[in-house]
């Protein structure tokens, strides 16, 4: 990771860390790096529903126009919608303004190349080098060589029509509950599932600029679980603020996470001859039960560092078509070049239809190990990982586990947090291991 770019683009508190001034420079320098070999390049921009989205969009657009790029605004749309449309509209670059599942005060900027994939480390390093220069030496076109801006608010519908044709039949006879996190999928997901003839109940579909991810969405699926039980729905689908994650709820109100969704997809794709190289790519955060279920079904797995960009890199390297994270980023590379909550939801409901099995039965074929993840706010992520007392308590706990479970201590890619995770045969043992490590992390480098 660089000085500005984290695991998922540039993030920060809007108007303090991620200022309009910085957004202008990111637009100008990012636009230049991605379009310098093209005459009159086209760049598309989407955003989620945050109040700061308009401010940052205006600054980004100005930066891009100053390089001579033509800018097309998509309005409110999901991150995978931008990824798809970048390639579908033959744009040289796509930009999404969002901080995903983060709270409303945060925002972020992430770029997609002309192929719809996130930027390489080399491209990000080139943009960062320009950001750090004291003098802006890039060309400044004038007159008719300046870029112009236009709106293409139909982009969301074009994207929905594309993902809709990935399923084999409609969803008539199913009652689907949706939680759109007051975010980018708020108008898209209800339209999509109603268009497929499902009965729908919705929540989190009234964005006001301030309520994105606030007690709703994929980070709060327990709220959707109540709606599923109240309405007697067959399935609940919870998206995050920018629509690149999915967490589901079965008909009994049980939460079905990204590991379980990946397993369900992998098993079905193997049975139907669609799973390339019989392999799923996941991260080190995936549950032990996920790997045991894959093994029992003759499916191999490939592990990466945490972050959907690392999953994607491994998928491209190995020629795999299914990967993702426990947090609900599911990548279906046959169809789209990033994690996609609505596409994953379509595939999950399609599997229910084709197998004629309820979600509880499909998810029940994987038994999760008890797991606990605690986030500790720290003063310095790097210092935490080098701290001798923290390293010692991790070693002691791992020895006590004796191979019956695991510990993972890692920094967040986007926030000043250390994540402490354990899996063990019982919840009680799991909790005890985590809290012992958390206490040492707090004592040594805690920010509170």
UniProtKB/Swiss-Prot annotation:
A UniProt-annotated Pfam family: PGM_PMM_II
PTM comment text: Activated by phosphorylation.
GO molecular function, one term: phosphomannomutase activity
Residues the record lists as Phosphoserine modifications: 100
EC category name: isomerase
Organism domain of life: Bacteria
Co-factor binding comment: Binds 1 Mg(2+) ion per subunit.
Active-site feature positions: 100
Single GO biological process annotation from the record: peptidoglycan biosynthetic process
Binding site for Mg(2+): 100, 240, 242, 244
Keyword Magnesium among UniProt keywords: yes
Catalytic reaction list: alpha-D-glucosamine 1-phosphate = D-glucosamine 6-phosphate
SUPFAM superfamilies reported in the protein's UniProt record: Phosphoglucomutase, C-terminal domain, Phosphoglucomutase, first 3 domains
Role summary: Catalyzes the conversion of glucosamine-6-phosphate to glucosamine-1-phosphate.
Entry-linked HAMAP family: GlmM_B
Family: Belongs to the phosphohexose mutase family.
Protein name: Phosphoglucosamine mutase
Native source species: Bacillus cereus (strain ATCC 10987 / NRS 248)
Highest classification ranks of the organism: Bacteria, Bacillati, Bacillota, Bacilli, Bacillales
